[in-house]
Structure formats: structure tokens, C-alpha cells
Amino acid sequence: MKQKLTDLYAKNGTKKVLASLLSILAGLLLGSIVVIIVGLAEQKITTAGMWEGVRLIFAGILSTGRDAAGALTWGFNAQNVGNMLFRAMPLIMTGLSVAVAFKTGLFNIGAPGQYLMGTLVSLSVALGIPSESVPVGIIWLLAFLGGMLAGALWGAIPGLLKALLNINEVLACIMTNWIAANLVTWMFDISSFKNVTEGTKSGYIYKTTFNGVATPKLGLDQLFPGSQVNAGILVAIILAIVVYIIMEKTVFGYELKACGANRHAARYAGIPDKRNIVLSMAIAGALAGAGAALYWLSGNTEFYWNTYQALPGVGFNGIPVALLAVNNPIAVIFTGIFMAMLDIVGLQLTNLTAYNEYITDVIISVIVYLSAFSLLIQMMLTGRKKKLVVEANKTTTADIPAEAETPPLDVPPEDIPDIPMEEAPQVPEQPEEGGEQA
């Protein structure tokens, strides 16, 4: 049994999973410490309130509110779980966007800009095509594909600059992020799409249901009543599986990873490294654009364009999602859901305790920073793994009896035939220098 556990621990996949879990646990523990410190500094938060805050951090998704006596109640909260899945959609997609680029040796910090371009095109198509003349389902599909295409084209720009001019993709992505932010703001400012103005806001609110376009629920609203969840989460999961198959089971995925491992060696092996760099960033951009389309085409969300003079946080949150998943597309599904769970936990902290909504951002920030330590934890676990393997080998060697190490020779010496050695070939004598030649 001990040997089986040692073999399981020695696997590289086990080490990666443990590193991510330890990073998450450390983040939650530090987040709890932050909650306690804030509670001690805030007079209106009691000791009982601090304890409730810590409990909500670890199990807030299962909180159902308070009973008549004011105590927290626990159980399966379908609304919370549904909203968590809804918020996980864009996080899964931006996490995939960052992970695909990482696999090719690139750092796609341009996911926010690609997400914004997907927002611009998907909303423009959903609100611009009249639903009176075109079926709503066709409009939704065109808007979704348009968002993916816009993200792909925006992501290809840093890829081209990297492949052709060797410009660092991080600098190029930062540049395109702010161009996208201002472009989206300007385009919606001059647009004539159908909108509604709320008296408390100075900008315009856009919602795809104004044109009758919304992602179908497929019965998920009955499974999670009162929540915003729709079929978009299924699309996100399917896309994650498709990305996994492409990256792990196809020649194209192997070429992308080969370029990420060593671009120059891949080129010498005949792999078109420049083409793969551009395609990798384009695919990453398409995934980020798809995340924006799934979120804004849901029919539940209202796009307020004035807020996008800043970059959307969901694009940057894709980075810790990918890091915690160790760039594995399947693991991105779970880390994206985990990050969405933290959002729901923050709402529970705000609604059920005296903490304000900003405490959640602090906790998420702590976990984001600690996600970068997952690689360090992997290195520490690797050292531990080598030690366990050495100890296991010593134990295995010690269990071998001494007489079994050198088996006795049962054949009598006189029965061993003589094996004649081949005679060395005769080398003709060379005549002395200056002598006569034969």
C-alpha cells in the first residue's frame, strides 16, 4: 500500500494537482486572516461576526441565509450554485485563452482587450440585426461567432508583432488592451442601438433581450431556480474539452507545444514557428471573445458602456485561473468555477455580515498572488518526491535476500566448453623508411 501511494505521489500530474490545491488552501487561510484583521479594526463587527465571515469564506456557497433567531443556515442553495456557474462562463473562457498561449510559450495578458472586442461585435450583431426579419436563433449564432472572430483578429495583432518583428507580446497586448477599451467606448457612444436610460446613470444600458436575443436555458433555470444560469456554461465546458483534444491529441497541438518548449528547435525540426505563434494568439483571442459573447448574450446582463473606459477584470482573472489549472484545459473548468464561487462568497459576506463588498476583492487578490506560487510549490514537492523515491528504492533493495543477489553457478567447471578466441589478423611488416619497395 505504501509503495502504491509513493508511486501515485511520484506522478507529475499528482504533483501539479497538489500544488494547486495547496495554493488555494493558503489563499483561503490568508483571506480568513484578512477577514479577522478587518473585523478587529471595525467596531461594528463583533467576534461572532468575524467567525461567521471565516465560515462564509470556506462554505459561503452553501449558505441559505439566516433563520428567525438570526443564526446562519446551511444547505444546498440552488440559486447560489446557478449564479456561480453563470459567472464561471467568462472565467473559463479567459482562463482557456491564457492557458493556450502559455502552452505556446506566450503570455497573453491581452485577454481583457480581446474580451472587449468580443463584447463590441457580439452586442453589435445581436442589437443590429432586426429580429423581425431574421430568426432569433440565427442572430444569436452570428453574434457568438462574430465575438469569437473579433477576439481572434485582436489577438492575432500581438502574435504578428511577435512573429515578424520579435516585439514582446506583453507590451503589444498592453497596447491593444487600451486601444480596445477606448474603441469600445467610442463605438457605443456614437451607436444608435436600442437602449434604455436609467435615471441614476448618465450612460446607456444595452441588453440583448431588447431585440429578443438571449441564450436558451435548456432547463437549467428549473434545475437552479432563481439563478442566471443558462446553456452558455455547457458551451464553455464543451469548448474546454475541444481545446484539450486539440492540444493533447492532434499534430497541430503538438506543434504548438513544441514551439512553446523551444521555438528554435521546432523551426529546425520543420515546424513553422511564426505561423504557430500567430495562430496561438488568434485562438487565445477567439476564446476570450467567446467568453464575452456568452456573458453578454445571456439576456440577463446589461452592458453599461461607460464602465469600459477601464479594462474588465474578468480578462485579468483568467491568468490565475490558468495558473491554478497548470494550463490544463480540463482543470480550467474547475478553477474557473472556483473563482466564480469566490464572487458568490463575496456577495454572501456583504449580504449576511457587516463586511462591505470590497473585502472579497482583497481575498481574491490574495489568491491571485498565491497562484503564482504554485510553480514554487511544485518544485518543493518535486524535491520531496525524489526523496520518497530514493527511500522506496532502498526499502525494495533491502527486501532482496543476500543469496539472491548473485545466483550460484550450478554447471561444473569441467563441463564448460573452451571457446577459442579469434586470431588477430596479421599486419604486414612495413618497409623501413628509405628501403626498397617490393
Where are these regions (language model features)?
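Transmembrane alpha-helical segments in multi-pass inner-membrane proteins
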Residues: 285-289, 294-365
